[in-house]
Amino acid sequence: MYAVTFDLDTNCLNENAVNLSKVYSDIRKFMEQHGFKWQQGSVYFGDETINAVTCVATVQILAKQIPSFAVCVKDVRMLKIEENNDLMPAIKIVL
């Protein structure tokens, strides 16, 4: 499974008069339309159709379609996830 994670510079967004809520909403909508599911924050997990090439291509298209992403992104990474383990049961054990 592949994932994309990124960090947007909120100062840059503000300086460019970009509405924070709208840009994050637009990014989420775009990612969901391209085979990714929002996980948390700025982390999106790809579905079974996503491989390394489609992951990179998706980020490139995102940068073209949402220019504020390209201008204000501080860090963007593609991750390959070998396992996706939910640790919530471990937290509940100690409560």
UniProtKB/Swiss-Prot annotation:
InterPro entries registered for this protein in UniProt: VapD, Virulence_VapD/CRISPR_Cas2
EC annotation from Swiss-Prot or TrEMBL: 3.1.-.-
Enzyme class: hydrolase
UniProt GO molecular function: nuclease activity; RNA binding
SUPFAM superfamilies reported in the protein's UniProt record: TTP0101/SSO1404-like
Keywords annotated in UniProt: Hydrolase, Nuclease, Virulence
Classification via Pfam families: CRISPR_Cas2
Assembly notes: Homodimer.
Family recorded in the similarity comment: Belongs to the VapD ribonuclease family.
Record's function text: Cleaves ssRNA, mostly between U:A.
Extra facts: There is no ortholog for HP0967 in strain J99.
Official protein name in the record: Endoribonuclease VapD homolog
